[in-house]
Amino acid sequence: MKTLKDLGDLKGKRVLVRADFNVPLDGTTITDDGRIKAALPTIKTLREEGAKVILMAHLGRPKGKVVPELSLAPVAARLGELLGANVPLAKDTYGEDAQAKVAAMNDGDVVLLENVRFNPEETSKDADERAAYAKKIAALGEAFVSDGFGVVHRAQGSNYDVAADLPAAAGLLVEKEVKALSKATENPERPFTVVLGGSKVSDKLGVIENLLDKANRLVIGGGMVFTFLKAKGYEVGTSLLEEDQLEKVKGYIETAEKNGVELVLPTDVVVNAGFPAGDTPVAPEVVAADAIPADKMGLDIGPESQKLFHDKIVDSKTVVWNGPMGVFEVPEFAAGTKAVAQGLVDATAAGAFTIVGGGDSASAVRNLGFPEDGFSHISTGGGASLEFLEGKELPGLKVLE
């Protein structure tokens, strides 16, 4: 994979950088600027080299139309604060305003182009249409840096097609992500433990299939665990269940046994009379995993399982975690996710290499107040890190080879 140093001397050069600024907003207030901060090392390095830094990114799903509430204006403002520099926002992605703002740049300046997904061609399935659009963006720059790890699993105009038109390389963030995820999956120090949670088994099928012969231990919680418990013959009450995945999951349980992979499931769960929303009161109770009442819904792993999961994680040299253990947004059902996060922090302190997969696990770690430096690596890509763990070829990385 080509990296920044492969681009040579960038002084005075116009460098297009595809970043991942898809941040959560409350109105125009950014509620988590983690993704913006993750892009700073690449931006600062390029500025120090005297490049003209032209940033592009998407925000939300405007579906190819201009949606004012999804403008990157709040991102430009926050970037300016973090860099201590003015970051003008172009009114378009490649039109007159973008061209004028780029033409006015001095060495070391930073400009942000407006939301690439305001253009229908950005996510078009028609390769020719995307390529023609990418050429218009590429005309603004003299080199391309791919630094939005959150989008490398998609072939889109601003991260895939642009790479065909300009000398292209991975930015520092993408390089760091690929190194960390490769280290965990290609040659992990053992014991290698994979912790999976989140609501659906179907989202994690590929990861389980790819890692069933690589991991020493699979630890499973979250909503997806009830399909595992049901596959073992337990009743799961009104808990989330994917009936159509039962046969697959039975197969995984058999394969794990055959491969000598330790499969760790909760021994107790925290249940409630239903999902804690609207009129449903929060009245948690702890029951054995094989004795969930017919009218109750499992929403977290129980205290015994929290200790079990924590100890299994600490007894590891490599840990990859993707997906929360319960409905962590509700304090009564957050203890399982906290226990797993604490397990990773304790394992890291003891010398293990730990990765928090992007998406919900990363936001859980932040929302629950864990320090980012307590983990070896917190991924910025939800879908991208999952597909990497599935062993898939990611189009946005392939074009940087």
Curated annotation (Swiss-Prot):
One example of a Gene Ontology biological process annotation: glycolytic process
Catalytic activity reads: (2R)-3-phosphoglycerate + ATP = (2R)-3-phospho-glyceroyl phosphate + ADP
Q: Which molecular function GO terms apply here? A: ADP binding; ATP binding; phosphoglycerate kinase activity
**Gene3D superfamilies (alphabetical):** Phosphoglycerate kinase, N-terminal domain
Say if the entry is tagged with keyword Flavoprotein. no
| CC annotations in GO | cytosol
* Cited PROSITE patterns: PGLYCERATE_KINASE
Under the heading Pfam families, the entry gives: PGK
Q: What name appears for this protein in its UniProt entry?
A: Phosphoglycerate kinase
What is the species of this protein? Bifidobacterium longum (strain DJO10A)
> What lineage does the source organism belong to?
Bacteria, Bacillati, Actinomycetota, Actinomycetes, Bifidobacteriales
